[in-house]
């Protein structure tokens, strides 16, 4: 798989993202199941950058604010290919609003490139091979006025996201699958994620409308190349008559694909996968399922599905 990006596709993503974000924010409709009031106070312990203000405004997500937040996370900023997940930003906001409104979060570890994550592991650091820091979906932090143990227990009770606590001053929080661990149960050095055993897929938001563009990405990969069947499935997750019905579709990938089993070589190639929801899609709960193809490793699942998302009424 060549690394040449589809520039037009990325420009189209920026346009669609801006239009959708503006439409929802103007009507004050939530985009995530766990989000706060749209304001955060952040500081980086690593590079001393700070952010204090609103990142979600009446006319959408503020690009200047998101750029500043990326700096705090030590992540490069590209509006066409954001490195820090909006879902993570919204979840940190959610935690701050409920545990200590207005508190500052000091980020001790934010975004990590795959190369940097590998270096951390090589020098014996507690970095998972499939770390969600590589996807901008995780943060280690300290919340002013709140014990990290309290944050850990609070996230555990939500049954959403990951929470790790090593009985020190910081806590790890991510927006991956619901799970929790400490220094005795982290499994970092056990090979738990080898051979793509934990591979998954997510959507960019939790709430959409018919006709919106859904942007998907695969996460927690540990071995490449990976073959992905170019036909995905939209499946109902309701209890009504739409439950279980699948709609086949071909999404647009971030890189050119060829054949019935295109191969992908890195994390970035398996991000920015887009598809426009049908304009007449009935409101309800859905998930997208994708199948792998070619040589599938023994521990790797043959297919994965996104967490359930909601399609609201127009």
Pin down the residues of each PLM region.
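Bacterial N-terminal signal peptides
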Residues: 9-18
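Catalytic cores and adjacent binding grooves of peptidoglycan-active enzymes
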Residues: 24, 38, 43, 126-138, ...
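Acidic helix-start/capping segments at beta-turn-to-alpha-helix junctions
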Residues: 104-118
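Short, hydrophobic beta-strand segments
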Residues: 262-282
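Internal, hydrophobic beta-strand segments that form the core of beta-sheet-rich folds
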Residues: 282-297
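Short beta-strand elements
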Residues: 295-314
